Amino acid sequence: MHAYLRLFKKKLSADELKLTERDARRCVILAIKAVDVINFEELLDLQAIKQLSGANEEVLKLLNLFTTTDAKGFEAQINKFAKLMKEEGLTKEELIVKKSYVQICSLSTDVTNFAYSDLAKLLNIDEDEIENWAIDAIQNKIIDAKIDQQKEEIVIKSHMLRELKKKEWQSI
């Protein structure tokens, strides 16, 4: 999918943009559905994605929601996209989990130990659900982590990086 998306990087004329709009919309939806696609900033940099308008503008707004809100804000606003979710076969629960993966991958790699309570607050989920969430995230290869039940913390060794910033490059 990423190779296909790179086709949208070049400068496109207005006519070419109209032709690629349907494909750009589809790529955004597929990226949202794909568990292992976390770097939405890369998508938002593509001209064809930036140019989504009209009926497809909702898709762009949903994509932006993943990168511009925290987990609590995301949950508060997700219902605005009910029609789009129904059209594309997206569920609120899937989108909330996806947002939690995007959120966890934005954490600094300098800190590795996270108390259940801190993660619950960050991800806007119940503290009782943190272990199950971590198990799912580990199985989906979003994070490489260990669960320390005694200390009630998740030790995150690494996570998928959304976008390598100077700080991340230095820590590598």
Task: Outline where the language-model segments fall.
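Charged, E/D/K/R/S-rich low-complexity terminal regions of large eukaryotic assembly subunits
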Residues: H2-I172
